[in-house]
């Protein structure tokens, strides 16, 4: 590992610490929102990624298999955090649990077969890459076909869904290209170049992602405010209609 790669990994770890702080602020701001408990799981995304990058900076989990270097913690990070990224998009869309589980599974299998393609060679490498690509396309079908059908007619919720979907969608187009151009693929770029690009993409994918939830938290708090207002209106109506001694 070069000094540049090690430094990039440490910078990424610090950036994810910032992301963890953002999720803590979001949790505090949500107050009585019924989404508060579920959205607390967002902390896993920057938290786990930060630990993984700290480990990568220390050289933990990097192994050589069949002459190919596999940065194990990178793939462990991806297989834990990226299903959460796409799963929460489905949650914001109001998709069914089955659909959310489907997109998370497609994402995890995409990563798993991609890791398999790194440590194999010849025809098998490209077969595994092809299978990974199929799950990649399946993931996009969920994001751009299945989930939009479930989004309620609420401007804030629809806006947050669109933002998250396009943010992740655009970045997910870059990852297979970097893999293909790097040592695991056709070897057009060096391992250092691929490592630096992956670190940049990971930070760009995850830290702004949790910030978007914080910046648009009204999509969740307004639901609570509306419900509270309805209860207060109902209470007032009962009070106004109740008989008094004068009656």
UniProtKB/Swiss-Prot annotation:
<feature type="transmembrane region" description="Helical; Name=Helix B">
    <location>
        <begin position="36"/>
        <end position="57"/>
    </location>
</feature>
<dbReference type="GO" id="GO:0005886">
    <property type="term" value="C:plasma membrane"/>
</dbReference>
<dbReference type="GO" id="GO:0009881">
    <property type="term" value="F:photoreceptor activity"/>
</dbReference>
<feature type="topological domain" description="Cytoplasmic">
    <location>
        <begin position="224"/>
        <end position="247"/>
    </location>
</feature>
<feature type="transmembrane region" description="Helical; Name=Helix A">
    <location>
        <begin position="5"/>
        <end position="26"/>
    </location>
</feature>
<dbReference type="InterPro" id="IPR001425">
    <property type="entry name" value="Arc/bac/fun_rhodopsins"/>
</dbReference>
<comment type="similarity">
    <text>Belongs to the archaeal/bacterial/fungal opsin family.</text>
</comment>
<feature type="topological domain" description="Extracellular">
    <location>
        <begin position="58"/>
        <end position="71"/>
    </location>
</feature>
<feature type="transmembrane region" description="Helical; Name=Helix E">
    <location>
        <begin position="124"/>
        <end position="151"/>
    </location>
</feature>
<feature type="modified residue" description="N6-(retinylidene)lysine">
    <location>
        <position position="206"/>
    </location>
</feature>
<feature type="topological domain" description="Cytoplasmic">
    <location>
        <begin position="152"/>
        <end position="154"/>
    </location>
</feature>
<keyword id="KW-1133">Transmembrane helix</keyword>
<comment type="function">
    <text>Involved in the control of phototaxis. Mediates both photoattractant (in the orange light) and photophobic (in the near UV light) responses. The signal is then transmitted to the sensory rhodopsin I transducer (HTR-I).</text>
</comment>
<comment type="subunit">
    <text>Interacts with HTR-I.</text>
</comment>
<dbReference type="GO" id="GO:0007602">
    <property type="term" value="P:phototransduction"/>
</dbReference>
<feature type="topological domain" description="Extracellular">
    <location>
        <begin position="183"/>
        <end position="190"/>
    </location>
</feature>
<keyword id="KW-0675">Receptor</keyword>
<dbReference type="Pfam" id="PF01036">
    <property type="entry name" value="Bac_rhodopsin"/>
</dbReference>
<keyword id="KW-0600">Photoreceptor protein</keyword>
<dbReference type="InterPro" id="IPR018229">
    <property type="entry name" value="Rhodopsin_retinal_BS"/>
</dbReference>
<keyword id="KW-0681">Retinal protein</keyword>
<feature type="topological domain" description="Extracellular">
    <location>
        <begin position="1"/>
        <end position="4"/>
    </location>
</feature>
<dbReference type="GO" id="GO:0005216">
    <property type="term" value="F:monoatomic ion channel activity"/>
</dbReference>
<feature type="topological domain" description="Cytoplasmic">
    <location>
        <begin position="27"/>
        <end position="35"/>
    </location>
</feature>
<feature type="transmembrane region" description="Helical; Name=Helix C">
    <location>
        <begin position="72"/>
        <end position="93"/>
    </location>
</feature>
<feature type="transmembrane region" description="Helical; Name=Helix G">
    <location>
        <begin position="191"/>
        <end position="223"/>
    </location>
</feature>
<feature type="topological domain" description="Extracellular">
    <location>
        <begin position="120"/>
        <end position="123"/>
    </location>
</feature>
<keyword id="KW-0812">Transmembrane</keyword>
<keyword id="KW-0157">Chromophore</keyword>
<protein>
    <recommendedName>
        <fullName>Sensory rhodopsin-1</fullName>
    </recommendedName>
</protein>
<keyword id="KW-0472">Membrane</keyword>
<keyword id="KW-1003">Cell membrane</keyword>
<keyword id="KW-0716">Sensory transduction</keyword>
<feature type="transmembrane region" description="Helical; Name=Helix F">
    <location>
        <begin position="155"/>
        <end position="182"/>
    </location>
</feature>
<feature type="transmembrane region" description="Helical; Name=Helix D">
    <location>
        <begin position="97"/>
        <end position="119"/>
    </location>
</feature>
<feature type="topological domain" description="Cytoplasmic">
    <location>
        <begin position="94"/>
        <end position="96"/>
    </location>
</feature>
């Amino acid at each position: 590992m070069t000094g540049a790669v090690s430094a990039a990994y440490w910078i990424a770890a610090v950036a994810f610490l910032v992301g963890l702080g953002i999720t803590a602020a979001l949790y505090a701001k949500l107050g009585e929102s019924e989404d508060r408990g579920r959205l607390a799981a967002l902390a896993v995304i920057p938290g786990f990624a930060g630990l993984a990058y700290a480990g990568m900076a220390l050289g933990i989990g990097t192994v050589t298999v069949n002459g190919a270097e596999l940065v194990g913690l990178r793939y462990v990070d991806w297989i834990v955090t990226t299903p959460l990224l796409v799963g929460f998009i489905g949650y914001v869309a109001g998709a069914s649990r089955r659909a959310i589980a489907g997109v998370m599974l497609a994402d995890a299998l995409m990563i798993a077969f991609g890791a398999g393609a790194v440590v194999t060679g010849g025809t098998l490498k490209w077969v595994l890459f092809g299978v990974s690509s199929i799950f990649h396309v399946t993931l996009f079908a969920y994001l751009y076909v299945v989930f939009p059908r479930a989004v309620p007619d609420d401007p804030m919720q629809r806006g947050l869904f669109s933002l998250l979907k396009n943010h992740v969608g655009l970045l997910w187009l870059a990852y297979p290209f970097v893999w293909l151009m790097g040592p695991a693929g056709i070897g057009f770029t060096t391992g250092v170049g691929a490592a630096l690009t992956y670190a940049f993409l990971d930070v760009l994918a995850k830290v702004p992602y949790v910030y978007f939830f914080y910046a648009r938290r009204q999509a969740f708090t307004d639901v609570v405010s509306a419900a509270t207002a309805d209860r207060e209106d109902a209470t007032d109506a009962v009070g106004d209609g109740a008989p008094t001694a004068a009656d």
